[in-house]
A protein has these predicted regions:
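Short, charged/polar surface micro-motifs in flexible loops or helix N-caps
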Residues: 27, 50-53, 65-68, 135-137, ...
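Thr-Gly-centered strand-to-loop micro-motif
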Residues: 47, 153-155
């Protein structure tokens, strides 16, 4: 199975409700390559669906505290392994939405050994409202989006293991090449539906641009 075929297989399950068999329940101790793992979550597979490693497609089950043998839930995310021959699905109770960061934190006990990319039904974008003071007035920075011809604040997708503020700082650096002073008591967020069960969360901080001659 090629990497593209693997990715297409995993992606086809995002948002679907399926039943999994659990072969490593919460608390299970597993040893691989002389490394011992204690599973803090339930871990199983979709019967009859073969993944990239030639075995049944594996699934992390999140937000279910008790050890189980079987569970029916919604696939809310995918862990793509860039340096391995298999990917993992992420399941939770139906209607649950977790960000890439929240998923990454819960599967870190295994995925810390791999280079991974995480997709989820909840996409989080973080950025900043940037202003400068001129003649006792505030001037706010807006970016013109080339394709939509609309204006927006600088923002971008949160990456695994980033905080919201770290994402906003990175986007300011990447999009407009500045560092700004963050106001400690201002953070606003909003969530809305996109399509096919996906939601988006946008988080904005208030920042002041100081000492940037090009702004």
């Amino acid at each position: 199975m090629t990497a593209e075929e693997r990715k297409n297989l995993a992606s086809s399950y995002l948002g679907k409700v399926v039943t999994i068999k659990i072969d490593r329940p919460k608390g299970f101790v597993h040893t691989k390559n002389n490394v011992e793992f204690t599973y803090p979550i339930n871990y199983g597979y979709i019967p009859g669906v073969i993944g990239g490693d030639g075995e049944e497609l594996d699934v992390y089950l999140l937000l279910v505290d008790e050890p189980l043998e079987e569970y029916t839930g919604e696939i809310i995310g995918i862990v793509y392994r860039k340096n391995d021959n298999e990917d993992k699905l992420v399941m939770a109770p139906r209607g649950t939405r977790l960000s890439q960061k929240e998923i990454a934190e819960q599967v870190y006990f295994r995925e810390q050994y791999y280079k991974t990319e995480i997709d989820s039904l909840l996409h989080v974008s973080c950025g900043a409202l940037v202003y400068r003071k001129r003649n006792s007035q505030r001037e706010y920075l807006c970016l013109l989006q080339k394709h939509s011809q609309t204006y927006s604040a600088p923002k971008g997708h949160m990456e695994a293991f980033e905080t919201e503020k770290q994402t906003a700082e990175r986007e300011l650096s990447e999009e407009i090449g500045i560092r700004a002073k963050f106001h400690p008591n201002f953070k606003k967020s909003a969530e809305y539906d996109i399509s096919r069960g996906r939601r988006k969360k946008v988080v904005l901080f208030l920042t002041e641009c100081v000492g940037e001659p090009n702004i």
